[in-house]
């Protein structure tokens, strides 16, 4: 896991992407400062929906970090025929998969959970009070839960796709296809049915619906949030099944 993280941080392009992903945090921080210090800027005052919208904004960066850091996690090992070497050590298949999973999940939490929690801290510092957090204490578990759900779903799906090919670029295309195709299909169904009840076909929509439910804001789609949860769990389960079949080697028990 440590080697995987170090490998990402050695790449200047990835560091630039991470820095770019924190720009929305800086913008929100300026807005919070203005709301706390200038009465005429009161319209920037934070609400629970402010943090929900922030995590929505970060979805774009989640996509790029996932493709950049996740596409080659298993594919590169397959290309180098390294799976046999890894799994011939006192390392189980589960340990190998968890290590790869943890690398991507940690990176995703760095662009979702970490800046969102920092925003809560910044709000308290600028306002000089914990009153907002006291009224909205559920934001801490809400931010944590949604960030974890997103990290688990996205990391599992990307690892499964990465295990299907030796070409990391092709894996990135597969992941983009999964996201954009399901989004497009959801859009077509919405036009045809004039309803959002079938929005669950898009995994992006499922995550958004769960986020709205977790943050206690109005749901954006006409589907029960448990349906969205089932779809997310189904994707994770399918990804685990793919990894179980594709990640193989000679396992040695110490």
Question: What is the predicted function of each stretch?
Answer:
Residues 1-9:
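A short amphipathic helical element positioned immediately N-terminal to and/or at the very start
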Residues 12-35, 61-64, 174-183:
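Hydrophobic alpha-helical transmembrane segments of multi-pass membrane transport/permease proteins
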Residues 30, 44-59, 98-163, 212-215, ...:
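Secretory targeting signals
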Residues 33-49, 164, 169-249:
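Terminal transmembrane helical anchor/hairpin motif
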Residues 53-76:
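Long, hydrophobic alpha-helical segments
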Residues 69, 73, 108, 147-151, ...:
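Residue-level hotspots within the lipid-embedded alpha helices of multi-pass solute transporters
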Residues 73-105:
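Helix-loop-helix units of permease transmembrane domains in multi-pass membrane transporters
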């Amino acid at each position: 896991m440590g080697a995987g993280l170090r490998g990402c941080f050695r790449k200047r392009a990835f560091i630039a992407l991470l820095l770019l992903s924190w720009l929305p945090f800086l913008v929100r921080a300026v807005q919070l400062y203005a709301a706390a210090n200038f009465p005429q800027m009161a319209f920037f005052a934070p609400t629970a929906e402010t943090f929900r919208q922030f995590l929505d904004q970060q979805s774009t960066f989640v996509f790029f970090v996932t493709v950049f850091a996740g596409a080659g996690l298993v594919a590169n090992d397959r290309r180098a025929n390294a799976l046999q070497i890894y799994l011939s050590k006192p390392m189980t298949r589960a340990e190998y998969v968890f290590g790869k999973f943890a690398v991507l999940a940690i990176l995703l939490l760095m662009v979702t959970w970490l800046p969102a929690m920092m925003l809560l801290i910044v709000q308290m510092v600028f306002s000089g009070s914990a009153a907002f957090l006291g009224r909205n204490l559920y934001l801490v578990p809400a931010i944590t839960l949604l960030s974890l759900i997103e990290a688990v779903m996205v990391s599992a799906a990307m690892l499964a796709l990465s295990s299907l090919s030796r070409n990391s670029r092709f894996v990135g295309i597969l992941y983009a296809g999964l996201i954009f195709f399901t989004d497009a299909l959801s859009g077509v169904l919405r036009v045809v049915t004039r309803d959002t009840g079938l929005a669950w076909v898009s995994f992006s929509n499922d995550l958004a619906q769960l986020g709205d439910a977790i943050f206690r804001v109005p749901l954006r789609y006409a589907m029960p949030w448990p349906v969205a949860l089932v779809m997310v769990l189904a994707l994770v389960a399918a990804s685990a099944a793919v990894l179980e079949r594709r990640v193989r080697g000679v396992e040695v028990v110490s």
